[in-house]
Amino acid sequence: MDYHIEMLSGCPALYLPAVRRLIIMALLGLPLLSCTPAWQQPIAPENISFLSRSETQTHDDISVTVAVPSEEETQQLFGTNLYKSRVQPVWISVENRTQQGLTLMRNAVDDAYISPAEAAFLRHAGPRQADREMDLFFQAAEFKNPVPPGEIVNGYIFTNIDEGFKNINVDLLSDAALFNFVFTVMIPGLNTGMEYVDLDQLYTAIENVTATEDLQARLQDEACCTTNQKGTATGDPLNIVFIGERSAIMSAMIRRGWHVTEINHMKSALKTTRSFVFGRQYLYSPISPLYHYGRSQDLGLQKARQSVSRRNHIRLWLAPYRFRDMDVFLGQISRDIGVAFFKNTLTTHTIDPYVDHTRDGLVGDLAYSQNLSGVGYVAGSQVSTEVDTHYNLTPDPYYSDGYRAVFFFSEETTPLDEIDHIMWLPQWHPGLQPNVE
């Protein structure tokens, strides 16, 4: 089929007579031809609001502040859209009140960090003089080692892009010690369900449970399973409980490679289609709504594998009670292992039917987060066996011993060998029973 190329504002545009082909190519995300805009004059950081979202930690006479600009803010700060090249600048400031010089270890921030020259080169658009000015600007913007005693140094590390949340690990090395700071920061721009749920306004009053036995009773009395929107049919079992401050919970999840999920909209639908067709990762793909407390999940998280058809995902609901002033979330975890085709829904995910394997796998996963302080099990979920099998809404069969894994999170670092394995009686999990001679 004939086609012609037309120059439009210095950028080639390709026109095909067949509209259908254009739609297909747009759907699959195959850009016809691209043109990088010329570099524009950057705006000074103090004139952009991203530093208002900065977070600071202080210990051992060292203060570290980090901030991550959004896509729009990055465009303003650097005069070009680095996000289009999958580059995300992280601003770091170090105040050194010790008597020794400090070195920021760039690989701790991102083991595959991008050099300033590479970040600039990815956005070169000419003319040559503008490209050279861009190179020099990016070099000047980078964080410069060392941080001398009594001084403050700040600048950017160019990292690979994350959306929704970013885990930032800052290691500072002196002649005598290594100082570690870990942050989990929210990044504006990803269209997630979190933006539409105000957890602090869900309940007019909330009970604070203080006795362990009362907490156990509340968790055991919760519904066994999620439901459909009308509450007329049960779905996947509610098989996990998260207890802790929200910041500690999110830090643990992000550190272990979990990502918040986008809501369903046209852009996310196109991303999902590309992931399914080409077998690509889509770290933030939407998950379908399930219901508890009369509403869909307050928070969705997933850990993607090779493609959108293979992933672990979690749905969480904030409970109408707290435990010793800590949030309590009821949740559901399952593992998608493929896609099945149905007449009414066209396609749907197939879950690993042995849901306890996925539940217990989360224990091992989050143990490495260093935010998990304790784990136990409590009854209340749905028992499902080969003889008496239960199904989710798909309907997929699942098998379970009917226990919920209860995770306790802390802001304090907890090594693996210090995680408390809670032996809750009288119905402790069979896998945690002590050996009896």
Residue ranges and their predicted role:
Residues 100-108, 168-170, 250-255:
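Short, hydrophobic/aromatic beta-strand segments
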Residues 141-206:
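Surface-exposed edge beta-strand/loop patches
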Residues 44-83:
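Low-complexity, acidic Ser/Thr/Pro/Gly-rich terminal tails and inter-domain linkers that flank the onset
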Residues 33-34:
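C-terminal motif of bacterial Sec signal peptides marking the signal peptidase cleavage site
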Residues 74-91, 97-101, 146-148, 230-231:
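Short, solvent-exposed beta-strand/turn "edge" segments of beta-rich domains on protein surfaces
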Residues 88, 95, 266-435:
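A cross-kingdom signal targeting lumenal/periplasmic-facing segments of multi-pass membrane
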Residues 97-148, 153:
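The feature marks short-to-medium sequence segments in extracytoplasmic or secretory-pathway proteins
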Residues 222-251:
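Terminal, regulation- and interaction-focused segments at domain boundaries
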